A protein has these predicted regions:
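Phosphate-backbone binding and catalysis cores of DNA-processing enzymes
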Residues: 1-115, 122
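Acidic, low-complexity intrinsically disordered regions
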Residues: 26, 84, 130, 192-193
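Short amphipathic alpha-helical interaction segments
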Residues: 59-66, 127-139
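Short amphipathic alpha-helical segments
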Residues: 103, 116, 132, 174-175
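Flexible, glycine/proline-enriched loop segments at strand-loop-helix junctions
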Residues: 110-111, 120-127, 166-169, 181-182
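A short acidic, leucine-rich amphipathic alpha-helix
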Residues: 116-125, 191-195
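Loop-centered beta-sheet repeat module
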Residues: 133-198
Length: 198
């Protein structure tokens, strides 16, 4: 029976080659940009141009790139993901803060249609003057109400499929799915690596 990856020892060179292959950098493993995003679950997305380059390195076709959105699904960090996945991953991994529940209703009212950051900042300054703007954006995205989308990266209200719609509310199944995607695209890796990443 094969041993789990965590108990196998690789040289640095072997590990590097295996990771390049699992990340789709030696051959193109996926047809489209959305296929890449779905395979990874989420990809670091702070720098929009870098994440777009990362997707284009791994896919043959980019016509479905509009299905890639950005939000805050985990680790208080901006990630890119498929519109089909960011909702359940956010619900599974985002950690709410005290006071966010009360703030959510006010933030939701601010974003009824796609807005630029400047437009949302202006609305938030009037409606929620005591709340830092970055917190408004994060609450909107961590609650699954909005994502950055489109060529202009507008803050866009969305109705995302969550854990209930995708996994019948089963967090164990959702965690197993996210873990499977992680190991297939980041391996060789350990359970500790996954726990840090998620």
């Amino acid at each position: 029976m094969p041993q789990p990856t965590s108990s196998v020892t690789f040289s640095r060179r072997e590990k590097a080659r295996l990771r390049l292959a699992s990340q789709g950098l030696t051959i193109r493993r996926w047809e489209s940009a959305e296929d890449v995003a779905r395979a990874f679950g989420v990809m670091q997305g702070q720098d929009l141009h870098s994440v777009r380059r990362s997707l284009s390195l791994r896919a043959k076709d980019h016509s479905d790139a509009e299905n890639i959105v950005r939000g805050y699904p985990m680790r208080n960090t901006l990630f890119a993901a498929s519109i089909k996945d960011i909702g359940w991953i956010t619900e599974l991994c985002a950690k709410g803060r005290k006071g966010d529940t009360e703030l959510r209703a006010g933030v939701t009212k601010l974003i009824e249609n796609p807005l630029s950051r400047a437009e949302l900042k202006e609305r938030a300054a009037t409606a929620l003057p005591d709340v830092p703007f970055w917190h408004v954006v994060r609450v909107a995205m961590e609650s699954g109400h909005a994502v950055y989308s489109g060529a202009d990266q507008l803050i866009t209200p969305v109705d995302l499929p969550g854990l209930e719609e995708t996994f019948n509310g089963d967090k164990v199944a959702a965690t197993a799915e996210l873990m499977t995607r992680y190991f297939r695209t980041h391996g060789p890796a350990t359970l500790r690596d996954f726990a840090w990443w998620a």
